A protein has these predicted regions:
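Nucleotide-sugar donor-binding/catalytic module of glycosyltransferases
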Residues: 1-123
């Protein structure tokens, strides 16, 4: 049954140009049982403010700010903060297809898999 909570972890560093598109694409997912964890990795632009603005209007969004430690450290912080049964990573300049998370969860459950991945699409 497709109802497992998915933690969407997004490391953020100086992504103000692409970040709104990324967050909007996650919020538009057809699979709604998600939490979005935005880890600002010491951005010097307006990325942290953008993260906070979205968190103020959707309680599924958590914002964590840390000094710059790199993308791997940011992902690890996101894992530690996650509450979902499944975890997926999205880069802050990515845009997801509306059914992207649904398809990953469906494949995990249909095939009793431990992991699912998705391909990149360049437009």
């Amino acid at each position: 049954m497709l109802n497992h909570k998915v933690s969407v972890i997004v490391p953020v560093y100086n992504s103000e140009v692409y970040l709104p598109m990324c967050i909007e694409s996650i919020l538009a997912q057809s699979y709604k049982n998600i939490e979005i964890i935005l880890i600002d990795d010491g951005s010097r632009d307006n990325s942290l403010e953008i993260c906070k603005r979205y968190a103020n209007v959707d309680n599924r969004i958590k914002v964590i700010h840390q000094e710059n430690k790199g993308v791997s450290a940011a992902r690890n912080v996101g894992i530690d903060a996650s509450e979902g049964e499944y975890i997926t990573f999205v880069d802050s300049d990515d845009e997801l297809l509306t059914n992207g998370i649904f398809l990953l969860v469906k494949d995990i459950e249909d095939f009793d898999a431990d992991i699912a991945t998705a391909s990149k699409i360049y437009v």
